[in-house]
Structure formats: C-alpha cells, structure tokens
UniProtKB/Swiss-Prot annotation:
PAS domain mapped to chain residues: 153-223
Domain HPt residues, every copy: 678-771
Pfam family, one: Response_reg
The protein's name in its UniProt record: Aerobic respiration control sensor protein ArcB
Keywords: ATP-binding, Cell inner membrane, Cell membrane, Kinase, Membrane, Nucleotide-binding, Phosphoprotein, Transcription, Transcription regulation, Transferase, Transmembrane, Transmembrane helix, Two-component regulatory system
Ranges where the Response regulatory domain occurs: 527-643
Periplasmic side: 47-57
Membrane topology designation: Multi-pass membrane protein
C-alpha cells in the first residue's frame, strides 16, 4: 500500500514536472505501445501468429481512444494534484495556524493572566485612587476650613492690632516700612499702603528720624531688643511721648528679615510723674522753708531756758524751766528726724566732719540727759572709760542727734531705776557708746524690727505702740552707718535694754533725735459697758477702769450685752472676743446693724492677739483693739484717742474722725501746707495721685506675682513719695515698708502690705478729701 502511494506520488510528480500535454502524450504513447504489446501477445497466444492488421488495429484503436482517456485522466489527476497541493498548503497553513493558534493561545493565556494581574493591580490602584481622592477631598475641605480659620484669625489679628492704642510697625533689612496698624497710621498721617517702602526720613521729622535710625541700627547691629522713650509729632502738631520697644524679626529657619516695633503712649504718665516730682519738690521746699522758721525760735527757747536755769530760781520755776528746755530740745530733734528722713529719701544727707571738743560734748550730753531723766524721777549716769580723746573729727550735730535719740528712748521706756551711758575709745579710731536702761525691755521677736522705718515697739503689755514718730532709730542707724559704724541692741524683757553705738572717729560726732512728751491732761469719767465672761478678767478690767474714775456695767454674755445696751447710755463698750454664746465680732456687727453709726460709742475689742486680728476687728465695725490683760497706759492712750478732755461737749463722731485722720494723714504737714499754699494745690496733687495710684497698684501686684523684688521696691518707692507729697501718712508708711527689703520677714509680709495698700488707698484718699473740705470751711 505504501509503494502504491509512492508510485502514485511519483506519477503525479512526473506529470507535474513534464506538464500536462507532454505527460499525456508520453502516457498515451506508453499505453499504445502497451496495447500493441498486449494485443500481439494475446494474438500470439490465441492464434500463434501476429498479423499486420492486428497491429494496425491496435495502433489505431490505441491512438483513437488512449489520448482522450489519458488526457482526461491527466486533467483529473492534475486537478486532483492541484487540489492536493492546495489541500497540502491549506493543511500546512492550518498547521501553521494551529501552531500560531497554540502560540497565541499560550500568549493569550499569559496575556489573560497578566491582564488579570493588571486588572487586580488596577482595581487595587483604583481603590487606592478612590481612597486618595477621598482623603484629598477631606484634606481639601480641611484646608478650606483652615484657610477660612486663618483668614478669620488674620482678620481678627488685624482687627486686634488696629484696635490697639499702641503703635505696631514692621521694617525690613533696608529699614523700609513693611506694615503697620491703625495707631501708626494716625501718628504718621499715612495709610499702610502709603507707608510701605518708605523710610523713617520720609515719615518723621529730621530729629525724630535720626533717633529712629540710630535705634534701628543698634537692633540690627547687636541682634537684641531695645526699649527707649521718644517724643513724636502727630499730623495736627500734637506731641506725644512713646515708650518704644524694637525687636529683631526672624523666620522659622533663623533668618532675620527686619524688625518689629511697638510703641505705647506714656504722655499722661510723664505728666503725672512731672506733677509728682513738682509736688515732691514743693514738699522739699516747704520743709526747707519751715526748717529755718522753726529752728530760729526753737534755738531761742533752748538757749534762753538754759541761761535761765543758771540763774536763781525757785524749785517750782526750775521745774517748769527744765520742762520747757527738755520739751524744746525734744521738739527740735523730732523735727530733725523729719528733715533727715526727707534728705535720706532724696539721698542728700551729707556729713560735716569738724573738730569737736569731746569733753564739752560729753558734759553737755550729761546735763541735758540728766534734765530729761529727772522729769521721770530717774537717775542718769555717765561712765567714761579713760583715756578719752579731748577732740575728735566728726559731725558733732549728727552724733548728738543719735545719742539723744537713744537716751530719749531709754528714758521713755524706763518707769523707774536708771539710765547709764558708757563711753570708750578703742584703737582703730572707733568711739563706742553704750546706752543702758532698766526699763521694760524689748521682746526677742522685735529686736530685728525696731530699726525699720516707722516701726514702734508696743508698750509693756503689747498694746498700743509707744508714742513717737517711729523713725528715730531708723534714721539714727542710717546716720551711724554713714559715719562708719552701726547701732546694735541687746535686751531682756522686763529688765531693760542696751543700745551700742559705734562710729569711726579720728575725731567724730553726731546729734540726737526724737524725744517724748507725756500728756498728763485729766481723763473724762466714762460710763463703760464691759462684755467679759471670765470673772478674773472682769475683776482686773473693772479695777483698772474704776481707778481712772469710770463707772462700769458688766455683761457676761453677748445676749446680755445686746439687751443692756441703749444708745446714749454708755460712752465706751469693751468687747471680749470669745464669749459663751457669740463672739465680740458678732456683737459689733449686730450693734452697727441695729443703730446708726453716730448713735454708737467707740466699740473696742479686748483680745490677746492684737497684731494678728486687728484688721479683722476693724472690718467688723470696731474702732480700736486693746490687748489683755487691760493696762492703765493702754487704756489711757485709747481714751485720749477718742476724747478731747479739754472739750467734753465735742461729739464722739468728730473725735473718731479726727483720730482716724491723724492715723491716716500727716495732719501737721497738711495744716502748714494748707496755710501756706491753700487747698487748691492739695486737691490738685490728690487728683494726680488718684490717677496714678491704680497703675502703681497694678504694677505692684504683677511684680509680686512675678516675684520681681526690684520691681516691687521701685513701685513701693514711687508710692511712698507720691503719698508723702499729699500727706497720706498711712500709705506713705506702707510704701516705705514695701520699698525696704532689708526689713525683717519682708518677703513674708510684703504680700499683705500690698493687699492692704490695694484695699485701703481709696478710703485714705476719701478721708483726706473730707479733711481738706472740713479744714477749708474753718
């Protein structure tokens, strides 16, 4: 079968090779020959011989039929071959196509897989894109909201800057304006757009521009902030003083872009300061004027009384003259304290060191001190440790002032016994004075306080402060330090005190200060309501009160006291604080609620803790506080405070007002000031003080909050000077305490002083206004 296929293939290939015609002719010829051969073979077999007709017939028959049959067959074969070839080609193409399809199928699968991956990636990317779009929308919304907020904040900041009365401006590195607020526009008369790119010389006067440029250069040169004051002109010609602060401006990477400036109008502050300085100068001028006017008659009284003491006198005349002499010297030295205090405030105390006859100095000191001691029945001893120099170089007046102050205090606080002054001179040119007394002594907790300005030691029972200005020891110690020495003190309560004065003296000396003048005027007989629940305290208080000529009714409870009290029936009510049913504070509040203030007598608290609770008692409506156990000196002083014994008909209200005024105001200075310059200058100064005080108090509080000790002291000094210039003694004393950080426990107490200043200054001003109005009517 295989060979047949090969033979057929050979047949077809030959036909295709020779062509249809030639192959047909060749095949026909071959068939004719074959037919002849077969015919001859058959004839030979059948007949045994071959005739020519047989051959011709075979040739003819073969030539007639074979070509057509061969041609037809060849055509068929050719067509079949062509069909086969076409089929072969088609098969080949199909194979190629199949292979290509297979390849494409593989590629398609790969592409499908890749496409699936791409689709997955695209779907993921699409999801991420959608998420990003969502986040972007949120971010866009947030940015829009932030932009709106920024615009609102920018608008608010701009409105805030424009609403500020302070100047705000910016200048770049070329010293050109980059922006400003509304206040700056008003100052320059130009809008912000007009100011941009202008330089100071284009905006200010030549003098002002020069200072502006100078300060700008300092800021740029040193890269530090700068604060200064400068007067600038408004377009209408009005001048204003500004406190200007300039700071370099940096971006977030630390690159400087220019400076920012702020300016606050302090014109009014300047005016107030100038007014206060003028008032202070007026006060100094006033003190200087009356210094001469008072010293002349005082010196005459002292000199003439001393001369008269050397003449023949009766015992009574000598006693009176000694009183006049000591009182005049005391008054003069108290005035010296006031003068020195004023000088120390202005830092103008100067020492006049001259040769001093020390022997005569001690003799004069002994004579004068002995006179003062005799007034109270005391012994005076001068114990010099020899040898002493005959002359020393010092300010004799100042040394005498210090010693007189120490001796006067020793006599003042000694009821019986003696006062001893010891003097010695050591190597190193130091003079030592010891002033020892046998008086009441000083509590240990007050030893460090007695040298503070205005501090006054309480009496022996811890009640009312002893009389005096409270400035003598403070002035004396400052003077001693100026003279190269100091004053120290040792004391034992109930046994006496010893003050030691040292000064540097190749030849040195100083004067005495401050004396004491007891007021022995008779006291009025009062009807007293004593509210006390402890029987022993009742006995002590009743005995003291009746000893002074008073009649006493006793209430043991608060309820009984309220029932017993009737307006006009009692001249004085003494209230114990701790009662069985209520406190003395409750009684005071109830009485002030029931009755008008003018119908109430003085309400005085009895307590064992005056210093801690006094302000609380005063706030509850009480008029004063006495310490228990009740003492004659304290009670006497309190009665003198509320009653003018020379005019028993004067109303209690007036007496209370006067006593309060004396505690709050510098009455002598105000009276003399009123007589010399009239009320207008006082009221003008007071008006200035009222304007300045809120600012002072605010600064004080802020400095206290910031614990700025220097700032507190500076503001305290300002307040002290301002209050003193208008006669507000209480505020002046508070200012003195606030400005004196060397006072004992200053840091613990300064907050309370500032709070007291804040709470009381308006009340003190009203008291002064009322006093001026009343004094003017007189």
């Amino acid at each position: 079968m295989k060979q047949i296929r090969l033979l057929a293939q050979y047949y077809v290939d030959l036909m295709m090779k020779l062509g249809l015609v030639r192959f047909s002719m060749l095949l026909a010829l071959a068939l004719v020959v074959l037919a002849i051969v077969v015919q001859m073979a058959v004839t030979m077999v059948l007949h045994g011989q071959v005739e020519s007709i047989d051959v011709i017939r075979s040739i003819f028959f073969g030539l007639l039929i074979t070509p057509w049959a061969v041609y037809f067959l060849s055509v068929v074969v050719e067509q079949l071959e062509e069909s086969r070839q076409r089929l072969s080609r088609l098969v080949q193409k199909l194979e190629e196509m199949r292979e290509r399809d297979l390849s494409l199928n593989v590629q398609l699968k790969d592409n499908i897989a890749q496409l699936n991956q791409e689709i997955a990636v695209r779907e993921k990317a699409e999801a991420e894109l959608q998420e990003t779009f969502g986040q972007l929308k949120i971010e866009i919304k947030e940015r829009e909201e932030t932009q709106i907020q920024l615009e609102q904040q920018s608008s608010f900041l701009r409105s805030f800057l424009d609403a500020s009365p302070d100047l705000v401006f910016y200048r770049n590195e070329d010293k050109e304006f980059s922006g400003c607020n509304r206040a700056m526009e008003l100052l320059t008369g130009k809008s912000e757009k007009q100011l941009v790119h202008l330089k100071p010389a284009d905006v200010y006067s030549p003098e002002a521009a020069a200072k502006v440029i100078e300060t700008d250069e300092k800021v740029f040169r040193h890269n530090v902030s700068l604060t200064y004051e400068q007067w600038l002109d408004y377009p209408d010609g009005r001048k204003a003083c500004f406190e200007i602060r300039k700071v370099p401006y940096y971006d977030r990477v630390g690159k400087r872009h220019g400076l920012m400036g702020f300016g606050r109008d302090i014109t009014e502050r300047k005016r107030y300061q100038d007014a206060l300085e003028r008032a202070s100068r007026d006060k100094t001028t006033f003190i200087s004027t009356i210094s001469h006017e008072l010293r002349t008659p005082l010196n005459g009284i002292v000199g003439l009384s001393r001369i008269l003491l050397d003449t023949e006198l009766t015992a009574e005349q000598e006693k009176y003259l000694k009183t006049i002499h000591v009182s005049a010297v005391t008054l003069g030295n108290i005035f010296n304290d006031i003068i020195d205090m004023d000088k120390m405030e202005r830092r103008k105390v100067q020492l006049d060191n001259q040769p001093v006859d020390f022997t005569s100095f001690l003799a004069d000191l002994e004579n004068l001190s002995a006179l003062q001691a005799q007034q109270k029945g005391l012994r005076f001893n001068l114990e010099p440790t020899l040898p002493l120099p005959h002359q020393v170089i010092t300010d004799g007046t100042r040394l005498r002032q210090i010693l007189w102050n120490l001796i006067s205090n020793a006599v003042k606080f000694t009821q019986q016994g003696q006062v001893t002054v010891r003097v010695r001179y050591d190597e190193g040119d130091m003079l030592h004075f010891e002033v020892e007394d046998s008086g009441i002594g000083i509590p240990q907790d007050e030893l460090d306080k007695i040298f503070a300005m205005y501090y006054q030691v309480k009496d022996s029972h811890g009640g009312k402060p002893a009389t005096g200005t409270g400035i003598g020891l403070a002035v004396s110690r400052r003077l001693a330090k100026n003279m190269g020495g100091d004053i120290t003190v040792t004391s034992e309560q109930g046994k006496g005190s010893t003050f030691t004065l040292t000064i540097h003296a190749p030849s040195v000396a100083e004067e005495v200060d401050d004396a004491f003048d007891e007021d022995d005027m008779p006291l009025p007989a009062l009807n007293v309501l004593l509210v006390e629940d402890i029987e022993l305290n009742v006995i002590v208080a009743r005995s003291v009160l009746e000893k002074l000529g008073n009649s006493v009714d006793v209430a043991m409870t608060g309820k009984a006291a309220l029932e017993m009290f009737k307006p006009g029936e009692y001249d004085l009510v003494l209230l114990d604080i701790q009662l069985p049913d209520m406190t003395g504070l409750d009684i005071s509040r109830e009485l002030t609620k029931r009755y008008p203030r003018e119908d109430l007598p003085p309400l005085v608290a009895l307590t064992a803790n005056v210093l801690k609770d006094k302000q609380e008692y005063l706030n509850a409506g009480m008029d004063d506080v006495l310490s228990k156990p009740l003492s004659v000196p304290a009670l006497t002083a309190m009665i003198k405070k509320f009653w003018d014994t020379q005019d028993d008909e004067e109303s209690t209200v007036t007496t209370e007002e006067n006593s309060k005024s004396e505690a709050l105001l510098d009455i002598p200075m105000l009276e003399q000031y009123l007589e010399l310059v009239g009320p207008k200058l006082i009221t003008d100064g007071l008006a200035v003080f009222e304007k300045m005080m809120p600012g002072y108090v605010n600064v004080l509080e802020s400095n206290l909050t910031a614990q700025d000790k220097k700032g507190i002291v500076e503001e305290g000094h300002k307040i002290k000077g301002a209050a003193g210039s208008v006669g507000l003694r209480h505020l002046q004393q508070l200012g003195q305490q606030i400005q004196s950080p060397d006072l004992p426990a200053w840091e613990d107490n300064v907050g309370e002083w500032i709070e007291e200043m804040k709470e009381e200054w308006r009340h003190d001003v009203e008291v002064l206004k009322a006093w001026v109005a009343k004094a003017t009517k007189k």
